[in-house]
């Protein structure tokens, strides 16, 4: 999935990162710019991009909030909440499947 291309060629890598998402992350963490957008097909680099993006926009780091922001942009957890409902449910299910039992 690291070389995945989605959204009619507009999203790259396992995290399906769009160029505008990458630009927001780079603006928050300028050192990311050294590799360029196409490097989001490298999982380690893509994870740094996602963390920079979420660090910029997430007020809290709940699964619900970060999933909605990753999927719907900065307003994904607030104004565009309804548009990100499906993605948030999928993220919660995936998290619950991997979460260790106490």
Give the positions of each predicted feature:
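Catalytic glycan-binding domains that act on GlcNAc-containing polysaccharides
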Residues: 1-102
């Amino acid at each position: 999935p690291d070389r995945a291309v989605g959204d009619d060629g507009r999203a790259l890598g396992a995290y399906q990162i769009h160029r505008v998402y990458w630009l927001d992350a780079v603006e928050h963490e300028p050192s990311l710019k050294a590799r360029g957008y196409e490097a989001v097909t490298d999982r380690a680099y893509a994870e740094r991009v996602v963390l920079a993006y979420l660090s910029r926009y997430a007020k809290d780091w709940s699964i619900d909030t970060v999933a909605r922001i990753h999927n719907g942009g900065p307003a994904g957890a607030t104004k565009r909440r309804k548009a990100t409902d499906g993605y948030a449910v999928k993220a919660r299910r995936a998290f619950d499947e991997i979460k260790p039992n106490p």
